């Protein structure tokens, strides 16, 4: 059963609808570092990552595989470092923030201060918080255009996982592309570009869309908007041709 107990050790409980089996016992505790080391190795091994990359560690000999090279490992209990190792790294309190908006390493003072220190460095560690920010901002920006954003669940999850500090920008494409079947345009924007298409109040596709970036642009997003407009123009031209 995976917990080193025999079937005869199981108890039965009946809630009136179903009978269930359960095991009750006491297990000897383990040192935090030992338990965390095992948990980390198990968690990494069982992550659902379809594609990994193999890279060399600093010794120039050892190779490991992960979705991207791991540069820092932070593990704290209160103010104390929990000694664990992973991907050739030893745990410490140093990490880094957003690669474009900060430059200096960050020393995490306390496990409880981690989230706020990372936010100060333009990284939002909590997945659920990033998703909530993205969804709320998409709705707000769409409403300002008297429109509604098409937000499929899988696309929301993907852009949430891709960004550290989500920022929403608006862009557009030539209205002539609206002659292409709406479903084709939406699929191209979502699948290839990770854009959120916009519909007007009557449900008609608009030639505007929203995109999730992780850059706080000094020009208010003008260059990002124009760059994405050029990219989507090529994509939609292909869709129109075929």
Describe each PLM feature range.
Residues 1-195, 199-204:
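Long, basic N-terminal domains or extensions that often function
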Residues 197-242:
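Function-dense linear segments that define catalytic or interfacial modules
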